[in-house]
A protein has these predicted regions:
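N-terminal targeting/anchoring "stem" of glycan-biosynthesis enzymes
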Residues: 1-188
Length: 188
């Protein structure tokens, strides 16, 4: 019925989605043996898979920093190799670049994560703070840890130059307000 109403455009969209699901399924099947090998190696080289929502800059920034802060507080987390993928369209590429300095993030990890759910006795997947805490620092980690997403010296210098270009010197205090219209969520 939808194809009749939408014509060839609807048919092509449905075909593309179906093909995408088939390709995803194939990649998940190919990832199952890798996950099985990682399970065997888990006692000596534990690996966990997780994800971050990247479609909202605030949630993305918080979740990455919160995860890094929790690693700093929980020393037994050091034994894990953590691999991540992103969910949603990346809201801010620069923030992603900062996150990639600290974490391994790659789209193919999604298939390992999905395959891990199919293999019995799975390792505990990493769940983003957005699900666990509503992207709130309920444990006070921000106040008890160092900042993890840092600018390089060159980035700091460029930022100081941009501020100087608009009349703000490095010694001056600045107040930033984060305000957005709800229309932002509907904008592309």
């Amino acid at each position: 019925m939808e194809v009749k109403a939408g014509g060839i455009a609807t048919l092509l969209t449905k075909f593309r989605k179906t093909l995408g699901r088939l390709i995803d399924g194939l990649f998940v099947l190919l990832a199952v043996p890798i996950v099985c090998i990682l399970r065997l190696l888990f006692p000596i080289a534990p690996v966990r898979f997780g994800f971050f929502f990247a479609d909202r800059i605030g949630h993305f920034a918080f979740d990455v920093e919160y995860f890094l802060a929790s690693l700093e507080c929980d020393r037994k987390s050091d034994k894990y190799t953590n691999l991540f993928f992103l969910v949603g369209k990346v809201a801010n590429q620069y923030l992603l670049d900062l996150a990639k300095r600290e974490l391994y993030i790659h789209r193919l990890v999604r298939y390992l994560y999905l395959a891990d759910k199919f293999v019995p006795f799975g390792a505990k997947a990493l769940i983003p703070a957005r699900h666990l805490t509503g992207s709130r620092d309920r444990r006070g980690l921000y106040y008890s840890t160092n900042v993890h997403l840092n600018f390089t010296s060159e980035e700091e210098r460029r930022g100081q130059k941009i501020l100087a270009d608009i009349g703000i010197e490095s010694h001056e205090k600045v107040v930033c307000l984060i305000v957005r219209d709800s229309a932002y969520l509907n904008a592309e």
